[in-house]
Structure formats: structure tokens, C-alpha cells
Amino acid sequence: MWSELCKSFLHLTRYALCQRRADVMLYYPRHFNRSADGHNPYFAPIVALCEEHGLKWIAIEEPDDATSCPRDERSIPGDAFFFLVTALRKVIRWFAPHATCYDIDRRVARIVDALTFHRLRARRYITISNSMLYVLSELNPNGRAYDLQHGVIYN
């Protein structure tokens, strides 16, 4: 677990410092990697479309220790992002006990946005199973956030 967290932190730091912003950000729990090669078959058509049209995309894979599905080598391990968001939610809830979950996620997004030098801002965010959708939709208020599994569009 600690090695995955450190690896994830290094990937996220490298992305925040060295990469240009993505046009499309994909975020999903690891247990959706159900293909034989460890890729997420639900995002395969979206990745193909992004590559076909020259859009820069990034995939962040949420940790899931309860699954035997392998990690996708094309995605950034999302352990550091996941634990940072979880810790910030708990701290903000402690200081603002009457805040709604939307208010908390908005505050979390502002902090994460500043810590990543606005590099996680994308024009489109696509998630599966509503994972981090509120946080991602608040990273870039001008972007669009979609939940692929439930067909929900935010922003």
C-alpha cells in the first residue's frame, strides 16, 4: 500500500509540474479494469476517440485493494489524489460540521486545484460510478463533468 501511495504521489507531482493540461480526464475505480490486458473496457471507445481527434487525455485510477484486477499502465495511480481528497473532506467536515457535502467538495476542489497548480483542470471530466464527480466538476467550473455509468451531466 505505501509503495503504491508513494508511486502515485510521484506520478501526480510529475503531472502537476511537467505536463500540459488534459482536454479529457477519466477517473474510475480500479475494479472496472475487467479486460484481459488490464484496461478499462468502458473507457476504451472514449480513449480511441481522444486519440483519433488529437485530444490530450489522462486517466486516474482510484485505488481498490479489494479487487484482483490489475492496474492499467496507461493511467496514473490515483492513491495520492484519493487519500488527499478523503483527508481534506474529513478536516473540512471537522471545521464546518454543518456544511453540505457539495460545499465540502467545492472547498476540497479549490485546495486540490491550488496544490496541483491548476493542472488537473480539464475541459471534460468523465467518471464511472460517480467517483469524485463533485470534486472533479468543481476543479474547473467552466468544464463539463459526466458520469458514464449513470448518464448524469454536471456543470
Cite the ranges covered by each PLM segment.
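Catalytic-core helical/loop segments in enzymes performing group transfer/polymerization on anionic/lipid-linked
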Residues: M1-N155
